[in-house]
């Protein structure tokens, strides 16, 4: 995988949930109708949950893959300080996954995540109204052919 990606810890989950980017916090609360801390707590029980430690030692992002290939991520502004390192580490992690299909939805307003997803090789399928506020989200997926 990467020297900067580690199994998720309680400390990393709470650090990231406490310092989310504006876009990620908005996507959690407005788009999914859930408190980011609840997502972080839930992620601790998953076997495939990770955190990205930036070169300056800060916990900069958490993410993971659920059993059905549903991929997710929450970031702090620290990832913007090391964008190339973060993107390359994410690519290594995604490319190492055994699932044939990785998928989820992303808030159309979250342009940072959309740009990263495009770099990682995900395809955007269609716009859908999603969540309690029926906001525009974009379905995306990546088919791993090996």
Predicted segments, located by residue:
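Short amphipathic alpha-helix that is part of the acyltransferase structural core
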Residues: 1-34
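Active-site rim helix/loop that mediates acceptor-substrate recognition in acyltransferases
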Residues: 28-47
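Conserved beta-strand in the GNAT
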Residues: 51, 56-72
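A structural microfeature
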Residues: 61, 126-129
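A short, internal acetyl-CoA/4′-phosphopantetheine-binding micro-motif in the GNAT/acyltransferase core
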Residues: 72-88
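Conserved acyl-CoA
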Residues: 88-102, 120
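Conserved beta-strand-loop-alpha-helix junction that forms the acyl-donor binding cleft
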Residues: 103-118, 129-133
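C-terminal "cap" of GNAT-fold acetyltransferases
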Residues: 130-146
């Amino acid at each position: 995988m990467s020297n900067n990606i580690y199994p998720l810890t309680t400390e990393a989950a709470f650090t990231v949930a406490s310092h989310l980017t504006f876009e990620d916090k908005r996507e959690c609360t407005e788009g999914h109708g859930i408190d980011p801390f609840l997502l972080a707590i839930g992620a601790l029980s998953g076997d495939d949950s990770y955190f990205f430690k930036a070169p300056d030692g800060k916990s900069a992002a958490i993410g993971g893959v659920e059993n059905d290939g549903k991929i997710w991520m929450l970031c702090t502004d620290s990832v913007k300080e090391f964008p190339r390192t973060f993107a390359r580490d994410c690519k290594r992690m995604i490319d190492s996954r055994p699932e044939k299909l990785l998928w989820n939805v992303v808030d159309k307003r979250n342009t940072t995540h959309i740009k990263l997803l495009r770099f990682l090789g995900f395809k955007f399928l269609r716009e859908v109204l999603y969540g309690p506020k029926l906001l525009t989200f974009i379905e995306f997926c990546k088919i791993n052919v090996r």
